[in-house]
Structures are given as C-alpha cells and as structure tokens.
Curated annotation (Swiss-Prot):
One annotated GO biological process: L-arginine biosynthetic process
Cellular-component GO terms for this entry: cytoplasm
Pfam families associated with the record: Semialdhyde_dh, Semialdhyde_dhC_1
Protein name in UniProt: N-acetyl-gamma-glutamyl-phosphate reductase
Family as reported in the entry's similarity comment: Belongs to the NAGSA dehydrogenase family. Type 1 subfamily.
EC primary class: oxidoreductase
Principal location class: cytoplasm
Subcellular location: Cytoplasm
SMART domains: Semialdhyde_dh
Keyword Cytoplasm: yes
Gene Ontology terms, MF aspect: N-acetyl-gamma-glutamyl-phosphate reductase activity; NAD binding; NADP+ binding
Length: 346
C-alpha cells in the first residue's frame, strides 16, 4: 500500500486520476489539492465520485503535502510543475508530472515552445513515461514525465516502423483529432458548446502546436536521427478520444502481412496496446474510458505510402491512465493494477 496525493485535482486529468485510483487496491489517496475548491468535498466538485471518496479538496503547502504522501501526481499547468517538483524530490518523494515541464530533454527547446525553465537541472533526471519504450528506466526513476496525449498516439503508432527502418522519417505526416477534454476544464470561448457542436476544425496548424517537439524528440530516438514532421491537430465535437492518422513513405517493398508481423512482435507482451487484425481500423468509441491504444494500418501500393491509425482515450492512456500505469511500474505493482477496465460502449 502506498500513500499518494494529487496536486491539482479539479481538472479533467485530476478527476480521472481520482476515478482510477479509487479502484486501485494498492493505493490510499491521502490528499487532493485545489485552490478554487478548497474546503469542498471532491465528490461535490465531481458528482461521479459520490459514494466512492470522502476526500476534501485542500490548499496545502508542499511541506504539508510531504507529511501526507510518498508519491505525487502533479496535474498542474506548465510552469507550475517546475516550481514544485524540485521541493518534492528534495524531500525524497516520487513524482509523476503530467505537465510538459520535464518531457523535453533540451531546456532550449522547451523555452522555444513554452517559457523559461526554472528547473533545468532536473531535465536529465526525468524519464519519459511511455512504458512500451522505457519500462526499465521507469522502474528506477524518482521523476517521471508523463507523455502528452497526441504524442502517445503517434509514437505508439510509428514505433515499429521506425525501429525496423522501413519508412522515410522526414516524410511523416500526423493528422490527429481530439475530443474537447484535451483543451482542459478552464472556460474558453473555443471550448463552448456552440463553438464546438456540429463542427470540426484544425488548430495549431503550421508547426504551432506545443506537442510537436515532444513527438519529434521521441520519434528521432526511434529512428536514430533528428528530423521534423508535419503535425496537424483537429478538434472534434466529442468529450474524449484521439484518433491519429499518420502517413509515411515506405523506403522498401514490403507486404502488409510483414508489417503486421512487426507490430504484433513489438507489442505482443504489452497489456494496453491492441494491434488490430489486418484490414481493421481503430475507432475512438472502442477505447473510451480505457487505457488501451488500438492500432491498425493500410498500405497504398500505388503511392508507396503506409497509413497508420491509432486510437486512444486522451484522458486515460493519453494522461491519467498512463500515469497510473507508470505508478504501478515505479512502485513494483502489477502493471495492469487498477486499469483493467473494459472500454465503455456505446
């Protein structure tokens, strides 16, 4: 049994962490923080938790928090995390940061895309928390950088191809669609019902989305070379889910069954990656509420391109579920503990 605290429990990621951890047999949630809802029951803020938790949201100092828990989920905005993580690490605590503050290896790249980094010395200590690629490192780390939602779907979709060296890395085009929870719970005009309902739009077009360097960093490691991709995110009028359609030029002649074998071999022991039968395509409704990533592909022999499709729930495998999966690895628990959830359909 481990005592955990959720810093920033009033956002979508925070409530999803609470939902998942309420079902975890090895976890005791000892604190949930929220400045906005301090003194309010978490189940009052999120009625879906009624009868499952009696926790009260609190506005605690780091010193007070360190007396409560051994492992911390930092579900706070960028810049905020880098201000609190060093204090938690200095107290000997384990930290899973769900912001982007420790995902990028280079402080210069982070500052180009986000803002000044005030804890640069910790970047080299952080492990990128994609279990399918970094399980051994995750098991040993004190500071884990939980991946972004779009990067998770794209990296898992492309990893077998890049490892096998059968595509031209610089040809990759990632076309991703996300539900509105990806924009967070804060009030924004672009997230209002009338702005989103019955519509579908691209945003962050032309190398403007902050997940771009994260995707390139990890794909570059898989390919053993630095390169740039074209990444265009879109906003869907649904609550949760990401579908990434990723295109790349093949650099050799290869049959679909050979590519299928590459995917099946890489992910055969992965509990949360489901490689679909040849000819099948993933869909967001079949991973909803779960920690699964469903992957399918097709080859266009006329153009010499492969089209990979990857579906995840952006709030689960794209955020809170992956964080719990990482916690399990860091703490030596069974990796599926608390996450063996059948996707919600319809």
């Amino acid at each position: 049994m481990i005592k955990i605290a959720i810093i920033g429990a009033s956002g979508y990621t925070g409530v999803e962490l609470s939902r998942l951890l309420c079902n975890h047999p090895q976890v005791e949630i000892t604190a949930v923080t929220s400045r906005q809802y301090a003194g309010v029951a978490l189940s009052e803020v999120f009625p879906n938790l009624r009868g499952r938790t009696s926790l009260i949201c609190e506005n605690l100092t780091i010193e007070e928090l360190c007396l409560r828990a051994d492992l911390f989920f930092a579900a706070v905005p960028h810049k905020t995390a880098m201000n609190i993580v060093p204090q938690l690490l200095a107290a000997g605590k384990k930290v899973i940061d769900l912001s982007a503050d420790f995902r990028l290896n280079s402080a210069a790249v982070y500052e180009e895309w986000y803002q000044e980094h005030s804890a640069k010395e910790f970047l080299s200590q952080a492990v990128y928390g994609l279990p399918e690629l970094y399980r051994e490192q995750i098991a040993k780390t004190q500071l884990l950088a939980n991946p972004g939602c779009y990067p998770t779907s794209i990296i898992l979709g492309m990893a077998p191809l890049l490892r096998a060296g059968i595509i031209k890395p610089q040809s990759i085009i990632a076309d991703s669609k996300s539900g509105t929870t990806g924009a967070g719970r804060g009030a924004k005009v672009g997230s209002l019902f009338c702005e989103v309902n019955d519509g579908f739009k691209a945003y962050g077009v032309g190398r403007k989305h902050r997940h771009t360097p994260e995707i390139e960093q990890e794909l570059g490691k898989l390919a053993n070379t630095d390169f740039n991709i074209t990444f265009t995110p879109h906003l869907l009028p649904i609550s949760r889910g990401i579908l990434s359609t990723i295109y790349a030029d093949l650099n050799c002649e290869i049959e679909a069954d050979e590519v299928q074998a590459l995917y099946e071999e890489m992910y055969k022991d992965e509990p949360f990656v489901r490689v679909l039968p040849l000819g099948s395509a993933p869909a967001t409704q079949y991973v909803r509420g779960s920690n699964y990533c469903d992957i399918g592909f097709a080859i266009d022999q006329t153009t010499g391109r492969i089209i990979v499709m990857s579906a995840i729930d952006n709030v689960v495998k794209g955020a809170a579920g992956q964080a719990v999966q990482n916690m399990n690895i860091m703490c030596g628990f069974a990796e599926q503990e608390g996450l063996e959830i059948v996707p919600l359909f319809p």
